Amino acid sequence: MDTELLKTFLEVSRTRHFGRAAEALYLTQSAVSFRIRQLENQLGVNLFTRHRNNIRLTTAGEKLLPYAETLMNTWQAARKEVAHTSRHNEFSIGASASLWECMLNAWLGRLYQLQEPQSGLQFEARIAQRQSLVKQLHERQLDLLITTEAPKMDEFSSQLLGHFTLALYCSSPARKKSELNYLRLEWGPDFQQHETGLIAADEVPVLTTSSAELARQQLSALNGCSWLPVNWVNEKGGLHTVADSATLSRPLYAIWLQNSDKYSLICDLLKTDVLDDQ
């Protein structure tokens, strides 16, 4: 199977938009559509349902997703081994799309600014679902995981980096939850427990995504509301808190293998504040 087809599938599943996937992959939208059709033809199933701007994974697509991520990660690892890439100057950091968009992108920029020019340290920023990243960490394919929920595994070490605040936002002022559609943004497996008490029990999300930026851009079009980080929204501007909603504090953890050969480097990197006044 052509790995470029899987790469395209993963990007469309992340953005839920052929146009944005095309931009991220530096392809035309027709090329992205063609690749998805090729993959669907090879598998003999439809991977997405397409209704105007609403693109969703089918059941087959949901089942393929973790395998596609695993295959791509394995392929990347194989390429590195074959190319005899030096590992001592590489450092891989994994997190969800929302964490990268809302806070880790800025942190990565600060890390580069603080690096000595002669260090030659090369960062790799990985975006994937938490379950996939935990597996990569366990298999030594990932050096550091940033997540909102620490996995309960003895071989992992963790450090609480702090907390950030989520609030329920919409695109218009003075709106109530009952007037809005709900856009579910994935903030970790345990977030749904908190979410249950803050959203009506019969509330069915019109959109579920792991991208805060995608959710933010869809709020107006979908007459929706979504849980977004307060500091990030303040920087972006243009949104309003839902009138009858509360705020929610979320922890942020750094996770690594207890016997990681990058332990000293991890300690040095974590001296730079990840949340930076979140």
UniProtKB/Swiss-Prot annotation:
It comes from the Bacteria. Residues 1-58 form the HTH lysR-type domain. Residues 18-37 bind DNA. One of its GO terms (molecular function) is DNA binding. PROSITE patterns: HTH_LYSR. Keywords: DNA-binding, Repressor, Transcription, Transcription regulation. The keyword Transcription regulation applies. The keyword Calcium does not apply. Negatively regulates the transcription of the flagellar master operon flhDC by binding to the upstream region of the operon. Belongs to the LysR transcriptional regulatory family. This is HTH-type transcriptional regulator HdfR. It comes from Salmonella schwarzengrund (strain CVM19633). The gene is hdfR.
